[in-house]
C-alpha cells in the first residue's frame, strides 16, 4: 500500500486532542510534531501541569505552552497557534479538533471522555483497552449513529492484529490462530541458568532441558517450561484485554478462558499454536492466543508484536518460503506471518488520519460484543471490600482474568472486569468463583455502566437492557 496515495486529501492538517499523557500519550505528542498531515497541540491530564510537562518533553516550544483553566482561555491559546494544556476534556472539546485520543487507561474516566467527544461531534481514537473491553462496540455504534468514527489505534496490538488478520483474509489464507507476544519475554542465559522476565531474575537451570522443541509433544514441552519457571508470572490481564478487542472485531474466540499462553521460541509458534490434529494445542481454528517469547540474551525479541498462523495449502511454495527464512512449523503444515513491533503513539497517526480524512476505523467495520473479560476470585473476597484496580497492568488483587462469551448484564452474569474494578462487594465471593454483577455495588451515575447498557440494548435487545436497568 502507498500511504501517500491513501491519505492524499487536499486539506489542512488534522487537529487532535490527546487525553492522558502517560507512555502512549507522550509518544503520540512527540511524533505529532513530525506528522505532516496531523497536529497534536492539545493535551489533557488529571493535572494540567502534567499535560504541560508532556508537551514540553515532546519538543513543544515551552514559550508556546499555555495552561488553560477555562474554555475561553483554551480558545484564545488555540487560535494563537499555541499548545494547550488542561485538566478536563470539557474545557477543550469545543476547540476545532477533529479527533480525541482517549489514552488514560482508566475505564470510568474514559467513558466520560468518550461521551464528551461524541456529543461534541469529534471522532474518537480509543487507546484505553480497559474502556474498550467493557463497551467498545457500543461506543462504535454510538459514534456511527452520529456520523462519527470510533477506532482502535495503530501502535497498540489490537489495531495492528486486526489489520494483519484482515490482510490475511483478503489474500485468502486459512487462519488457524491470531495473537501477540506477551508483555514480557523470558530471557534465558544457558551459561548461568538464570531467567529474566519483567525486571525479575530467577535461577532456573532446569529450563536448559526444555530449550529445544525437537520432536517432543507440544503439550508436554509447554507444561514442562511452565513448571520450570513457575516462580515467574505467566498470565497478564492486558494480554487478554487486548485479544478481546480483536475478538470483537473479527469474531475469533479464545481456545480456553485463560489462553494457552505457551512459553515458546519464535520459530516454535506455528508448531505449538496449531490444531491438535497437527500436533498443536488448539481445539479449533480462528483462535486467539498469546505466547511468551523465550529467547537467549543475544537473540531478538518479538517486541510485543502480532501474528497469524496460517495453513500451508501449497507445500512446494511453503517449502520455498521456509528456505527463504519464513517461520514454518516443524511438519510444514502451518506458518507464522507476523509484525514484530508495536510502536505506541509513534504510529498512531495512521488511525487518526483514517478517521478524520477517510471516515473509517482501523478496526472492524462494525464491531460486535463477542467476548467479555471477567474476573475469577483466586482467594475469598469478603463482603464490603473494594475491588481496587492498581499497578502498571491495572489488575485487581485476589482475582485472575478470563475471556468468556459476551452476554447482556444481569445480576447472574459475570461482571466485566473493568466494570467491577473499584466497586465494593455487597457479598462474599468465594475463591474460584466468577464475580457477578449481583456481587458488586456499581455507582448509579457510572458513565461506564451507562455505556455498557447502551451496548447491551444495541446488540442484545431492549428487553435485556431493560432487565439490566432494573436490576443492576
Where are these regions (language model features)?
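Rossmann-like NAD(P)H-binding beta-loop-alpha module
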Residues: 143-147, 152-227
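Short acidic, glycine/serine/threonine-rich loops at helix termini
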Residues: 55-56, 136-139, 162-165, 186-192, ...
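Short, ordered loop/turn segments at secondary-structure junctions
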Residues: 46, 105-106, 128-132, 155-156, ...
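Rossmann-fold NAD(P)-binding glycine/threonine-rich loop
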Residues: 104-120, 128-156, 166-167
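N-terminal glycine-/serine-/threonine-rich beta1-alpha1-beta2 phosphate-ribose binding loop
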Residues: 1-116
Amino acid at each position: 500500500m502507498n500511504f501517500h496515495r491513501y491519505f492524499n486529501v487536499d486539506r489542512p492538517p488534522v487537529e487532535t486532542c490527546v487525553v492522558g499523557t502517560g507512555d502512549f500519550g507522550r509518544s503520540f505528542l512527540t511524533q505529532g510534531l513530525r506528522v505532516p498531515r496531523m497536529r497534536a497541540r492539545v493535551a489533557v491530564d488529571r493535572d494540567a501541569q502534567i499535560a504541560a510537562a508532556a508537551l514540553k518533553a515532546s519538543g513543544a516550544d515551552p514559550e508556546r505552552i499555555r495552561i488553560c483553566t477555562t474554555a475561553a482561555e483554551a480558545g484564545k491559546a488555540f487560535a494563537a497557534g499555541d499548545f494547550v494544556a488542561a485538566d478536563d476534556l470539557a474545557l477543550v472539546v469545543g476547540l476545532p479538533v477533529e479527533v480525541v485520543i482517549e489514552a488514560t487507561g482508566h475505564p470510568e474516566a474514559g467513558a466520560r471522555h468518550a461521551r464528551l467527544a461524541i456529543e461534541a461531534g469529534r471522532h474518537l481514537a480509543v487507546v484505553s483497552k480497559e474502556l474498550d473491553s467493557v463497551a467498545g462496540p457500543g461506543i462504535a455504534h454510538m459514534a456511527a449513529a452520529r456520523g462519527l468514527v470510533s477506532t482502535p489505534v495503530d501502535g497498540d496490538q489490537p489495531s495492528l492484529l486486526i489489520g494483519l488478520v484482515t490482510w490475511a483474509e483478503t489474500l485468502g489464507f486459512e487462519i488457524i490462530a491470531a495473537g501477540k507476544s506477551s508483555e514480557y519475554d523470558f530471557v534465558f542465559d544457558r551459561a548461568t541458568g538464570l531467567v529474566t522476565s519483567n525486571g525479575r531474575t530467577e535461577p532456573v537451570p532446569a529450563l536448559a532441558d526444555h530449550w529445544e522443541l525437537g520432536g517432543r509433544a507440544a503439550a508436554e514441552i509447554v507444561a514442562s517450561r511452565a513448571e520450570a519457571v513457575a516462580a515467574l508470572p505467566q498470565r497478564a490481564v492486558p494480554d487478554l484485554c487486548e485479544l478481546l478487542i480483536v475478538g470483537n472485531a473479527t469474531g475469533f474466540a479464545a481456545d480456553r478462558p485463560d489462553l494457552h499462553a505457551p512459553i515458546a521460541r519464535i520459530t516454535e509458534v506455528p508448531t505449538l499454536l496449531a490444531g491438535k490434529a497437527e500436533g498443536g494445542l488448539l481445539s479449533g481454528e480462528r483462535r486467539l492466543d498469546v505466547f511468551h517469547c523465550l529467547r537467549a540474551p543475544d537473540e531478538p525479541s518479538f517486541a510485543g508484536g502480532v501474528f497469524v498462523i496460517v495453513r500451508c495449502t501449497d507445500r512446494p511454495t511453503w517449502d520455498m518460503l521456509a528456505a527463504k527464512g519464513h517461520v514454518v512449523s516443524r511438519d510444514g503444515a502451518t506458518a507464522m506471518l507476523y509484525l514484530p513491533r508495536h510502536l505506541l503513539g509513534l504510529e498512531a497517526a495512521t488511525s487518526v488520519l483514517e478517521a478524520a480524512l477517510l471516515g473509517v476505523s482501523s478496526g472492524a467495520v462494525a464491531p460486535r460484543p463477542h467476548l467479555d473479560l471477567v474476573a475469577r476470585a483466586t482467594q475469598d473476597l469478603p463482603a464490603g471490600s473494594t475491588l481496587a484496580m492498581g499497578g502498571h497492568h491495572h489488575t485487581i488483587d485476589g482475582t485472575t482474568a478470563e475471556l468468556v462469551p459476551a452476554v447482556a448484564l444481569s445480576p447472574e452474569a459475570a461482571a466485566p472486569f473493568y466494570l467491577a474494578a473499584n466497586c465494593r462487594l455487597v457479598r462474599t465471593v468465594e475463591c474460584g468463583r466468577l464475580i457477578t454483577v449481583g456481587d458488586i455495588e456499581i455507582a448509579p451515575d457510572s458513565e461506564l455502566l451507562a455505556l455498557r447498557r447502551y451496548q447491551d440494548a444495541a446488540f442484545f435487545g431492549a428487553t435485556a437492557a431493560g432487565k439490566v436497568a432494573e436490576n443492576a
